[in-house]
Amino acid sequence: MSRVAKAPVVVPAGVDVKINGQVITIKGKNGELTRTLNDAVEVKHADNALTFGPRDGYADGWAQAGTARALLNSMVIGVTEGFTKKLQLVGVGYRAAVKGNVVNLSLGFSHPVDHQLPAGITAECPTQTEIVLKGADKQVIGQVAADLRAYRRPEPYKGKGVRYADEVVRTKEAKKK
């Protein structure tokens, strides 16, 4: 049995936590995040820490409490430090540019690909083949990165495509005659 829920989430100075039933709102310098927790979870805010436990009558109380603890810990980190995700474009002529909140990609198609960024997410291109996504919500950043990667996933023979910066693409050997 995992004991994740037993550890409290420390709330640093400058972070405001509001608990309204099962709706938790966390506000910090990088923005405000809100999440509705499962009914099986009970959250208490005391001594600059959030503690978690199961409610009576729910069989999966501890499991849901561990999930809630991990989600709220990510929210606290997001509103204080923020999250970043880096993508690389590998391939001849593959380019990226950011105009406002739109990422423009040239990925070898007959048309450019424009991807609208959701609110709270910013993108920048240090080089034409790199994209850096920044924001407070870890889940949204991961989803945007997955959406950008899905336009041209790395292919297994040359590794061309959009990949995460820390991703290792397994390449196959070409067919022999």
Curated annotation (Swiss-Prot):
Q: Which keywords are on file for this protein?
A: Ribonucleoprotein, Ribosomal protein, RNA-binding, rRNA-binding
Kindly list the biological process annotations in GO that this record carries: cytoplasmic translation
In the UniProt record, does the keyword Ribonucleoprotein occur?
Answer: yes
Q: Which Pfam families match?
A: Ribosomal_L6
Cross-referenced SUPFAM superfamilies:
Ribosomal protein L6
User: Could you tell me the superkingdom of the organism this chain comes from?
Assistant: Bacteria
Q: Which GO terms describe its molecular function?
A: rRNA binding; structural constituent of ribosome
| One of the record's GO cellular component terms | cytosolic large ribosomal subunit
Q: What does this protein do?
A: This protein binds to the 23S rRNA, and is important in its secondary structure. It is located near the subunit interface in the base of the L7/L12 stalk, and near the tRNA binding site of the peptidyltransferase center.
Family membership: Belongs to the universal ribosomal protein uL6 family.
Q: How does it assemble?
A: Part of the 50S ribosomal subunit.
Protein name per UniProt: Large ribosomal subunit protein uL6
Q: What species does this protein belong to?
A: Salmonella typhimurium (strain LT2 / SGSC1412 / ATCC 700720)
